[in-house]
Amino acid sequence: MFKIGVMVESFRKGLDGGLKAASEIGADGVQIYATSGETHFDKLKGANLVSLRTKLKDYRLEVSALCGDFGGHGFQIAEHNPKRIEDTKRVIGVALELGTSIVTTHIGVVPDEKSNPRYAVMARACEKMGAFAENEGVVLAIETGPENAITLKEFLDDIGLKKGLGVNFDPANLVMVCRENIPQAVKTLAPYIVHTHAKDGVNLKPVSAEQLYNSFAEGGIEGFHATDYIREVPLGEGGVDFDSYLKVLSETGYSGYLTIEREVGENPTADIRLAVEFLRSKVGKKIFPGRKN
């Protein structure tokens, strides 16, 4: 059955505080950003790496995945890709050191039209990273959201790697941006799903994925406000029907992590605790007290 994870950064308490909080609310594991702050891949080596391993062991937490998201436009811009590809390879190396075989990332907006030059640019970058990941026994999991499930599946099919590329399934992104039918999206992407985010949201009015993600990449666009179009909400309060979603996800054979990602809210710890309780109730597991105070 599913495991419950939490993104350490969602607590907004730093690494130590986030690990402690994750243990206290009964998470099975954590996802950690490896591209910024104290867990940047450049810093996770030597004594720092040993220290993190020790903390994870003490709190009895495993790493569900590393987040290797570099922000910006992902892998849409050819001249930026060589460095991003090499940095992603380094994140993959850190993932192995921490005992996880999954690295998640946003790659940008995959064009609907395969004739769009950006499609080939992104495919080449993903092929290089995916081939490296496959050789290392790791899966680079592309997060859902900017494009619909069919477009992403065809993109992965076109690249043709058997193991090195996968999907980090975020149902809220698909609801907020694409207004997707989540159970159907799961069925479409099932062969590739290796990790998921537990998040909920609503689409307030139709929005262009290009415009929305360009706004995120560029730190805002004058006259465009993302919150006019999409809104993240607590689990169970948005457009994701978790009963049908988890049922179909289970039927596909997925038994990995449901990793809570909370990017808004004034009291993230309280929100995450409620999210854990919500998910435990759905998967039939009892809440248990923190492992270490």
Report the location of each language-model feature.
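N-terminal pre-domain/capping segments
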Residues: 1-100, 191, 276-293
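Acidic/histidine-rich catalytic cores of soluble enzymes
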Residues: 4, 29, 66, 124-239, ...
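Active-site beta-loop-alpha junctions enriched in small/polar residues
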Residues: 7-11, 33-35, 68-71, 108-110, ...
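Active-site acidic/histidine proton-transfer and metal-coordination neighborhood
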Residues: 14-20, 55-62, 74-167, 176, ...
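Residues at the N-termini of beta-strands
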Residues: 29, 102, 195, 256-257
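Alpha-helix N-cap and loop-to-helix initiation/capping positions
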Residues: 43-51, 79-87, 114-124, 147, ...
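A short, acidic, amphipathic alpha-helical segment used as a generic capping/interface helix at domain edges
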Residues: 237-251
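C-terminal/domain-terminus segments
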Residues: 256-279
